[in-house]
A protein has these predicted regions:
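Structured alpha/beta or helical-core interaction and ligand-binding surfaces enriched in interleaved
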Residues: 1-172
């Protein structure tokens, strides 16, 4: 896990997106909810992970080199375990969720900022996970591309043309 570079240059995805990649990541989904406190999403995500045979995840913060939490999804539900992030005030740092095989990754600078899921779709399990996720939870590259010249788009209002271009330059 140490070979993953975690630098969040700016807190807003629209300025410069978080860089935490291993170069194998080739599909991306963006989200605007708290990765550690959106219990409705976490409940859903826990089920999708298990259905796609992901049985463990590690949770990192930007202040520690080792995981602050390792969750065996067969034995523990993600929600009560991830609440420890709030109990121990880790939500003041960046959050990264990643499986031991590094086939996908989710990162968010602060819980109020936009975050990104990254997938290595050459990995069959990761491709299956990407396909299984309900895209209504996320903003896709396609949606960003459509919003680039549409000033009435909520994404254009959120990021502006320069912000969307920065995201597309880093992720498309």
């Amino acid at each position: 896990h140490r070979n993953i570079l975690i630098t969040f240059e700016y807190s807003w995805l629209s300025r410069t997106a978080p860089y935490f990649f291993n170069k194998k990541y080739d599909k991306f989904l963006f989200f605007d909810f708290s990765l550690s406190a959106s219990y409705e999403f976490l409940r859903y995500f826990n089920q999708v992970l298990l259905l796609n045979d992901y049985l463990a995840i590690d949770i990192y913060t930007s202040i520690y080199e080792d995981p602050v939490l390792s969750i065996d999804l067969e034995k523990k539900n993600i929600i009560p375990t991830i609440r420890k992030l709030y109990e121990e005030e880790y939500y003041f740092t960046g959050t990264v969720v990643i499986p031991p095989d590094l086939s996908w990754c989710a990162a968010q600078y602060y819980s109020v900022d936009w975050g990104v899921f990254a997938f290595d779709t050459h990995n069959k399990k990761s491709q299956s996970l990407f396909n299984s996720l309900d895209k209504d939870w996320f903003v896709t590259i396609y949606q960003l591309q459509k919003s680039l010249n549409d000033k009435s788009s909520p994404l254009y209002e959120e990021f502006g043309r320069e912000g969307i271009e920065a995201i597309l330059n880093n992720y498309a």
